[in-house]
Design a protein with these regions (language model features):
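Conserved catalytic core of Hanks-type protein kinase domains
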Residues: 89, 193, 220
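Conserved AAA+ ATPase core "coupling" helix
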Residues: 33-39, 106-107, 121-161, 165-170
């Protein structure tokens, strides 16, 4: 029960919750705290009204996800302390907030994402990973699928001939398969190249993208998205 229901007197009005409201999203980051996700308890008001009273307890996103879906994006960016708190909730159905042991109705579907190659991330413990079934999602298998993604996600402000879109996507995919690169461009690179080449055309007063627009956009779009392997950086630097 939530604090309102627990301390209510008499009948409580019911409210239907839509599917969208049952989907709770949490964005992982190093500064995310246990209080952000689990909730916070005001110690002074807790002494007066009780730790789970409406006055003392501020529910976090995990509490709001009960009987719904908790989607945690970039879980491995969350600090270790928060990961341990989540583990306690998933395993025991309760959590420690401050100096209080709180019973949580942890009845939700927990979905999380992570990019194992990213920097500035925390290692997920084997115990926490054991709570998940893991699905590895790679890049689009074929060029046609990637082109559809670029068209669906990219903003359109000028006409892009089909052959130029094919060139952009093919170029990005060729870099992705380059054995000399340690860091390769994602699908976002294709979307950025698609949008940047259009911007170049519009600034030049044209309504259709040319191959020159694509070429001029390549460096600003691709340069920071690729990186040579360390051994090759050393050799090429000599």
């Amino acid at each position: 029960q939530c604090p309102v229901c627990r301390h209510a007197k008499g009948k409580i009005k019911q409210k239907k919750i839509s599917g969208n409201e049952r989907f709770i999203r949490v964005q992982g980051s190093p500064d995310l705290t246990v209080e952000d996700v689990l909730g916070d308890i005001d110690p002074i008001k807790a002494l007066q009204y009780g730790p789970l009273s409406v006055e003392a307890f501020t529910p976090g996103k995990l509490f709001k996800a009960n009987n719904g879906i908790l989607f945690f994006d970039e879980l491995n960016r969350a600090p270790e302390k928060l990961q341990n708190a989540l583990l306690q909730v998933l395993e025991e159905g309760k959590a420690t907030i401050g100096s209080y042991d709180v019973d949580f109705a942890a009845n939700f579907i927990f979905i999380a994402t992570m990019n194992p190659k990213d920097v500035s991330t925390e290692k997920l413990s084997d115990v926490l990973l054991d709570r998940f079934d893991i699905i590895y999602a790679g890049y689009p298998e074929d060029e046609e699928t990637e082109e559809k993604i670029v068209l669906a996600k990219g903003e359109k402000i000028a006409d892009v001939p089909a052959n130029l879109l094919e060139i952009m996507v093919s170029f990005v995919r060729s870099l992705r398969e380059d054995k000399e690169l340690e860091k390769v461009p994602s699908v976002r690179a294709g979307i950025a190249l698609y949008e940047r080449s259009q911007s170049t055309a519009v600034v030049a007063g044209r309504k259709e993208v040319t191959i020159e627009d694509v070429k001029s956009a390549v460096i600003s779009v691709i340069a920071h998205r690729i990186e040579l392997k360390p051994s090759l950086r050393y050799i090429k630097g000599q």
